Regions:
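N-terminal phosphate-binding or glycine-rich loops at protein starts, especially the Walker A/P-loop
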Residues: 1-48
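Short Gly/Thr/Asp-enriched flexible loops that form oxyanion-binding sites at enzyme active sites
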Residues: 18-22, 109-123, 183
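Short, acidic/small-residue loops that bind anionic groups at enzyme active sites
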Residues: 31, 38, 119-142, 196-203, ...
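Flexible, glycine/charged-enriched surface loops at secondary-structure junctions
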Residues: 31-37, 162-169, 220-223, 251-259, ...
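Glycine-rich oxoanion-binding loops at beta->alpha junctions
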Residues: 46-103, 143-150, 154, 336
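Accessory alpha-helical/coil subdomains and C-terminal extensions
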Residues: 94, 105-107, 115-117, 144-252
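C-terminal non-catalytic interaction/assembly regions of soluble proteins
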Residues: 238, 242-336
Length: 336
């Protein structure tokens, strides 16, 4: 058998570990041929590929980013929307001309949706979910999330000392456009006093009261963790807006910090390396067993899979009955 691997969408710690997990399992255990497709689905359209062997897959386990490159282009979706039916056929043609028996698509929600569309066309496809946002429906955790939470938590830990020294409010903005998983997990792990996520509406007056109540109790500084996707006035970044509103409400000097792309870069944590390796290996096992049109998932501590058509278009969001939200509120943490 011959399989192709591509990575699409934003970069994420653990992609290379996944490529390694798929490739080494395929080559060393199943005797398959493996090629890497450059720059996501664009590389499939252009037949921009490389052949993998055991040696070329060595030394990449701990590397951030993706050795295959990536892009956010979704040519398949755009072409279908514009009615250019010849281009989807070009994808099929190139798949066949490359001699592929299966395509492994490593990516987030958009990538898995595209993978599902390719599967519906009759191509053999396996999806492997990746995003630091942890918002892909059907899997408990996506690789990259643990690394991002570790980076954000370390930043929050460091900001505690400057906040306490200057008796300030520090507002830390982390990634999470539609889902607040990073803010929730890093905010709880980092001892945040206020955690704001897109899923839970907030009241700036209540936030101000929380901070002033801390001041009355002899706690002259506060840590506020916000997801980038919370509602603002539409003109400012989340952290900037919340910092200005808090300072206006409380009169306490407030500063903001935006972590940005640092959360996506660098070496994956041991947890993410192991999760990526397991997911990659399971993807190859499905291929060997002829089980296509599925996305790899983590359920509890077990690697499993789900049909791609059940995944497409669905987001996994934080709910108010999430155990971390419930426990945080019990300890006096303000969620808005």
């Amino acid at each position: 058998m011959k399989i192709g691997i591509l990575s699409s969408g934003g970069d994420c710690p653990g992609i290379n570990a996944t490529i390694r997990g798929v490739g080494k399992t395929a080559i060393m255990h199943y005797g398959m041929e493996v090629i890497g497709i450059h720059s996501g689905f664009v590389g499939l359209l252009n037949k921009d590929v490389q052949t993998f062997d055991e040696r070329s897959l060595s030394g990449i386990l701990n590397l951030g980013g993706t050795i295959l490159g990536t892009s956010r282009e979704k040519p398949f979706r755009k072409l279908l929307a514009s009615g250019e039916s010849e281009k989807p056929q070009l994808i099929r043609q190139n798949y066949e001309e490359l001699g592929l028996d299966c395509l492994v698509c490593i990516g987030g929600n958009g990538t898995q949706k595209t993978a599902g569309m390719l599967s519906a066309m009759g191509l053999n496809v396996i999806g492997v979910p990746k995003t630091i946002d942890n918002d892909i429906w059907g899997t408990d955790i996506t690789f990259g999330f643990d690394t991002a939470v570790n980076i954000a938590t370390e930043a929050i830990d460091r900001l505690h000392s400057t906040a306490s020294s200057h008796k300030r409010v520090m507002v830390i903005e982390v990634m999470g456009h539609k889902a607040g998983w990073i803010a929730l997990y890093s905010g709880m792990a980092g001892g945040g006093d206020v955690i704001l996520i897109p899923e839970i509406p907030y009241n700036i007056h209540r936030i101000g009261e929380t901070i002033l109540n801390r001041l009355k109790k002899g706690k002259p500084y506060s840590i506020v963790v916000v997801a980038e996707g919370i509602q603002t006035d539409g003109r400012k970044r989340a952290a900037e807006y919340i910092a200005q509103e808090i300072e206006y409400e409380t009169g306490i000097e407030t500063r903001e910090t935006v972590l940005g792309y640092i959360q996506r870069g660098g070496s994956p944590t041991p947890f993410d390396r192991n999760l990526s390796t397991r997911m990659g290996g399971h993807a190859t096992e499905l291929i060997a067993n002829g089980q296509f049109g599925r996305m790899i998932t983590l359920k509890g501590n077990e690697i499993a899979s789900a049909p791609l058509e059940e995944i497409a278009g669905k987001l996994k969001l934080v709910t108010e009955d999430n155990d971390l939200v419930v426990q945080g509120r019990r300890m006096g943490i303000c969620f808005g």
